[in-house]
A protein has these predicted regions:
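Contiguous alpha-helical segments
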Residues: 2-164
Length: 164
């Protein structure tokens, strides 16, 4: 387990006075704008920056580690794997997985993650394409993603390249 440096609440005030705060996940001092606030701690910034909190949320939802999801963000350069739209803060990227592997709606086994996609690709284009796949001529960008998803190239999925 990695060493996590927590920010003592009394030290938090010193950071805030300087307009920065310490992210306990990425271990960086960042501008306050990079943090959400925590009402349970009197409005102090959360312990994780917004990007890291998003990674934690995605990792937990898909039964993966923080490092797995962080590696995927880095590997994809914070872009959608299909339509290369860049999301500098990671906001708006969804962790896609093979829904045929995980038939229970809203659940993920964590072993069939494929990549990070923008909402348009994850919620619109890809589900539509998966329904008509094989009935219409192949669309190369989607075929490429389904046949060799970014998570597979990092060894983060049980599915080998070429299976979709």
């Amino acid at each position: 387990m990695p060493l996590v440096l927590r920010t003592p609440t009394d030290a938090g005030g010193q950071f805030i006075e300087r307009g920065v705060y310490w992210c306990t996940s990425c271990q960086q001092e960042l501008p306050l704008a990079h943090f959400g606030t925590d009402a349970g701690r009197g409005g102090l910034p959360r312990g994780n920056c917004k990007l890291c909190q998003g990674i934690v949320t995605r990792a937990n939802k898909h039964k993966r580690t923080f490092l797995d999801v962080h590696l995927l963000f880095e590997h994809q350069r914070y872009k959608c794997a299909i339509c290369p739209v860049r999301h500098s803060d990671g906001d708006g990227l969804h962790l896609d997985h093979d829904h045929a592997c995980c038939p229970r709606k809203g659940e993920s086994c964590g072993q069939c993650i494929r990549g990070l996609l923008c909402w348009g690709c994850n919620g619109g284009v890809l589900p539509w394409y998966e329904r008509i796949r094989g009935q219409e001529p192949p669309y190369p960008p989607l075929e490429s993603y389904l046949n060799d998803p970014p998570a597979a190239s990092l060894g983060l999925t049980k599915h080998s390249s070429g299976s979709a």
